Amino acid sequence: MIQPFVSVIVPVFNDSERLKKCLSALEKQTYPQQLYEVIVVDNGSDEEQDTKGVVNQFSQAIVVYESRPGAYVARNKAISVAKGDVIAFTDADCIPATDWIEKGVANLLSVPNCGLVAGQIKYFFKEPDKPTTVEFYDSLMGIAQKRFIALNYGATANVFTFKSVIDQVGNFDETLKSSGDSEWGKRVFAAGYEQIYADDTCVAHPARSSYAQINKQMRRITGGWHDMRKKEGYSGFGLVKDIVTLDLKPPVKTIFRLFVGQQIFPWAEGSAKGIPQKLEFLYVMVFIRAVVISERVRLYMGGDSKRA
C-alpha cells in the first residue's frame, strides 16, 4: 500500500516551551520523514515567545501566521497551505507517541469510507505518582475521545482525516473559539463518512493542575457552547433550561460512586482515595458548575466568548 503524504497541523498561542516538546516528538516519528510535514500556526503570540526561533530548530516543521484570534481560524490557515492528502491535528501542549503518524494513517486507511480517526489522549501529571485532585479530575473529565466518537466527533488534539473530506464538508467554523471540532465532526458524520476511535494512535497531554486553569478552560468551552446555541436562536428560556437541567441538577449517581469508591465516570477508569480527596473532588465539581453558570449568564448578557 502506498503511504500518503501527511500534513500535521499545530496551532500555538503563547506556548513556545510546550511547543518545543511537541515538535521534538514530531521530529522523531517512525513515519518516513520525506512523507510528512509539520505546519505550526502562530495565532498572535507575544514577540518574546519567538515561535519562529523554536520552529527553526526542527527540520520537519515550518511556521505560518494567523493574526485573527481563534484556534479554528489558525487551523484553517494551515489547511490552506497543507500539501498532504492526509491531515493530522494536534495541539502545542501535546506530546505525540513516536508511532503516532504511522498508527493514525494506518487506522484511517483500514476502514472503508473513513472520514475521521480520533486517537487516544493520555493525561500525565506534574508528579506522576501524586496527582493533585484537580489533575485527577481533569484526567477523568478531560478529552475523552472514545465518548466523543459516540457523539460523532473527535477533539482536534488528536484527529486524522483526509484533505478530500475537508474539501467536501468544509473548513472549521471560524466564528467559534471552542467546540469547533464538535461542529466540524458532526458535519463529517452527516456527510456519510465513518468515524473511529483508535486507542493505539496516542498523544500525551498534561492534566490541568490549578483552579485557575480549570476556570479558564470551562469559560472557553462554555463560550463555544454558547456561540453554537446562538446560531440556533438561543433564548432566555434556553438559558434557564440549561442552568436548571444541566448545571443545577444534582449528580446523584456520580456522588454515590465517588463516596463508595467505585469508578466515578463510566467513560474513564479511576476512583477517589480517602475522604479528603473525595471532598475536594466534590468541591471541584461544584466549582466548575458555578463557573459554567456565571459564564452562561455573562455571555447571554452580551459578553464575548473567550479564546484559548
Located regions from the model:
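Short aromatic/hydrophobic "clamp" motif used to bind/position activated sugar donors
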Residues: 87
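Acidic donor-binding segment of Leloir-type glycosyltransferases
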Residues: 23-65
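N-proximal low-complexity "stem/linker" segments adjacent to membrane-targeting elements
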Residues: 1-28
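Glycine-rich, basic loop-to-helix element that forms the pyrophosphate-binding segment
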Residues: 49-52, 66-82
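Short, flexible, basic/aromatic active-site loop/helix in glycosyltransferases
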Residues: 119-120, 134-151
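Non-catalytic, C-terminal membrane-associated alpha-helical segments of glycosyltransferases
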Residues: 219-223, 237-308
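Acidic donor-binding loop at a coil-to-helix junction in glycosyltransferase catalytic cores
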Residues: 178-184
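Conserved donor NDP-sugar-binding/catalytic core segment of glycosyltransferases
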Residues: 99-131
